[in-house]
Amino acid sequence: ISTLNLGTQSGSLKHVFQKYLKTSLVADKLASFYGTHSIVIGNKYMFFTPEYTTLNGEKVTNLNSFDDGAIVTNDGMLIFFENGAGWNGNRLYIHIDVNGFNKRPNRLGYDVFSFQIDQNGRLLPMGAKGTFYYDANDKYCSQNSTEAYNGIACAYKAISDSSYFKNLKN
């Protein structure tokens, strides 16, 4: 995967998605700003303080892998992008908060699911073999795990295990 441009020029990720989605907001950048995040659209900012928790309910204190861009769809779904060129080996992550950050529980593995685009351009559910957060012992998708990103690797289980949602604790 080559480094993706998340900015405003032609050919950027923003323009790629804008062609295919009717979106209410397309972010040029998501940036930390005094403890809040802002979706920047041209010269307008939408400020918010996203509070996400792990699968077991612990607060996620580091949202660095959610901060390279975002799209808010007309129905409120929030799609985050992470272009990890450099720090994680040119991996591209897509995180989807299916009901948006204004609706709870905002919990990894419950209403927030992550995907990775691999070196061959395949979209993989996080937790599948070959993804960055794959772990045979489920340390990134276990209601008992204390990992900082516990729940980030649950997309694979949610797709492949028909009882996944029945077994989730509220």
Feature map (PLM): residue ranges:
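Membrane-proximal N-terminal amphipathic helix
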Residues: 1-15
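Intrinsically disordered, low-complexity regions enriched in Pro/Ser/Thr/Gly and acidic residues
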Residues: 16-170
